[in-house]
Amino acid sequence: MKNINPNRTQAWKHLKQHFDDMKSTSINDLFNQDKYRFAHFSKTFNNEILVDYSKNLITNETIIKLISLAIECDLIEAISDMFHGEKINCSEDRAVLHIALRNIKNTPILVDGFNVMPQINAVLNKMKQFCNRVIQGNWTGYTDKIITDIVNIGIGGSNLGPYMVTEALKPYRNHLNMHFVSNIDGTHIFETLKNLNPENTLFVIASKTFTTQETMTNALSARNWFCKATSDAQHISKHFIALSTNTIAVRKFGIDPSENMFKFWDWVGGRYSLWSAIGLPIMLSVGVSNFELLLTGAHDMDIHFYSTPLHENLPVILALIGIWYNNFFQVETEAIFPYDQYMHRFTAYLQQVNMESNGKCVDRNGCPITYQTGPIIWGEPGTNGQHSFYQLLHQGTKMVPCDFIAPAISHNPISDHHEKLISNFFAQTKALAFGNTHLTSMQKYIQSKKNYKHEQCIVPFKLCKGNNPSNSILVKKITPYTLGALIALYEHKIFTQGIIFNIYTFDQWGVELGKQLADSILPELKYESMISKNHDSSTYGLIHCYKSWCG
């Protein structure tokens, strides 16, 4: 994989010139110039997902120049390298193979000359057997009661992905009650456990290293709660399982690794791991067949990404449009608005995948970067956000490109709720793009009011300038298949941007510094020792105040 500084490419120079030509263009002008603009700037995926990117400040020339940038940055070779098991995560000397986890066609994928598919299939089969036993009531607790509650203890990728998917697929859930504990704040584990019965509760401890501070602190508290109720640590084997690679630590905890540990590999990044054993809570929640459909949807998007020409390639198109705004319009954020309540954790999930992946300031050569890399990702489900921050989107001074996502078919077609929801989706993308600045329509509005003079005075305050870009992603229905495809769509968008940014998307060294400092500060809070004089005055003052208040 080549290391190419994007802003030294010819394509980047051409895009800067093109931006100078485009910056005074309006979305309204673009639609007026092309009555078939929707047809020209929208694509479907397997007749299940429609991506409409027509409400963007782009032309055919923009797309051509952006694709030239992708080609000059050697995106096609980078895609091939990932799919063929090359160690593209060079800072950690690892392959990047979440795509292998959903390789349902079982095509051989080699890492260091070894086909990884047999070991993937072995873990997947072990997951299926275990989940079927729990779901069917054949796995019982220490008093022979069936399991009714699953508590997943993990953080980051070991929590966000499984939690998001189980929430998004609630219509497919079985009888098991799912709980997710991530925060080291004792309130999280306390509030989760206080209404549970240890006799029918199963704990899933999800940690690759089995040393993650937050996860193991919560896991030990859960084990203490369980042992206090049962008075016998031997019963742990029926109520605790591990998703990990650390056999020694898992056994020390009291879990039998040969039976109750589900492994994964160093080429699976945490934020890309819901397809692996980390996805076991998903399989427990929705069953084996639905988990397989989730994998199938992602795999089909993988094939689309790998084999489709760049100008037809949905992840590539979305990535390039994002770079257009991020690096030429200099916007700093992207908003994601799922108009589906089941998808309420989708933005938080993508926030981690994107910001932990592409929030980097050093390029693949180890040099400081002089251009913007990953954007800030934020958002809320619609229509809640409309009564919160959409005011800024419509009349503020910042450009915020938005992705609107909604299903055409609702799982809960109550009265006309869904039609009203979708009408808001369509209305918001239209209002953001076109505003209400058309003189004739404003005059008609003013003339329709009784207090004509007053309305004339407040016209400037009611004007919405429009020209705010958005993508509309309409899904036929949120199913395991379409959700898998949608997640993979964004994964590959992020990968594409990372290649063009010339960064290592799959490491996260910035997470480590805070962990190290917390480990050094912890003894100063727990014991009567003196506070280190090596702290800055702010940290010293905070620790001193904390200790004085806590006695």
Swiss-Prot record:
Catalytic activity line of the entry: alpha-D-glucose 6-phosphate = beta-D-fructose 6-phosphate
Superkingdom per UniProt: Bacteria
Catalytic residues (UniProt): 356, 387, 515
GO molecular function, one term: glucose-6-phosphate isomerase activity
Pathway where this protein functions: Carbohydrate biosynthesis; gluconeogenesis; Carbohydrate degradation; glycolysis; D-glyceraldehyde 3-phosphate and glycerone phosphate from D-glucose: step 2/4
Keyword set, alphabetical order: Cytoplasm, Gluconeogenesis, Glycolysis, Isomerase
Record's subcellular location: Cytoplasm
Keyword Transmembrane helix: no
Enzyme Commission number(s) from the entry: 5.3.1.9
GO CC annotations, alphabetized: cytosol
GO biological process, one term: glycolytic process
Claim: Hydrolase is one of the keywords in the record: no
Entry similarity comment: Belongs to the GPI family.
Function: Catalyzes the reversible isomerization of glucose-6-phosphate to fructose-6-phosphate.
Protein name listed in UniProt: Glucose-6-phosphate isomerase
Source organism: Blochmanniella pennsylvanica (strain BPEN)
Lineage, broadest ranks: Bacteria, Pseudomonadati, Pseudomonadota, Gammaproteobacteria, Enterobacterales
